[in-house]
Every structure is written in C-alpha cells, then in structure tokens.
Amino acid sequence: GKDEWAVFQENFDLIHENFFRKLKERYPSLTPSDLKLCALLRLNYSSKEIAKMLNLSIRGVEAARYRLRKKLALDGKDDLVTFMINFK
C-alpha cells in the first residue's frame, strides 16, 4: 500500500496547486525530506512541531532549515515560512 507520506503529498498537491511539482521543477536538488520540510513550513508549523513530525531534534530541524535556505538561495532577510506560503 501507499505510505502515509505519499498520500499526504498527493492531498497536499491538490490543495496547494501542485506545490511539490513546482518546487521540484524550480529546485531539482530538493530531496524528499526537503520537500516534507517545505510542506510543514508552508503550513506554518513551528520547529518544535516539525521536529515531532519528522522525528528530529530541534537542532536537526534548524540545520535542515539552514540547508534548505542554501538550496533555495534565500538571503538572510528572506523568511523561509513566508517564502513557502507565497510560493506559486
């Protein structure tokens, strides 16, 4: 059967107009775990909530967010959550 994440991804794509597809097109280097993080940030989850969902430590989440910013080439003043919410 499909894993929970695959189902989540499909539903999320429907609601958020191909969010994952467009992200992957624009940023081909994003991994499946990057995409998970992107989705949770778009839903405005806190680092604490994300840590729980992804089974990471808070520091692990902070590190993942940092790597994600690098991949998206965001500079210091760009907010990751705002970027995800506004991404089309």
Residue ranges and their predicted role:
Residues 1-88:
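Cytosolic nucleotide-binding catalytic cores of signal-transduction proteins
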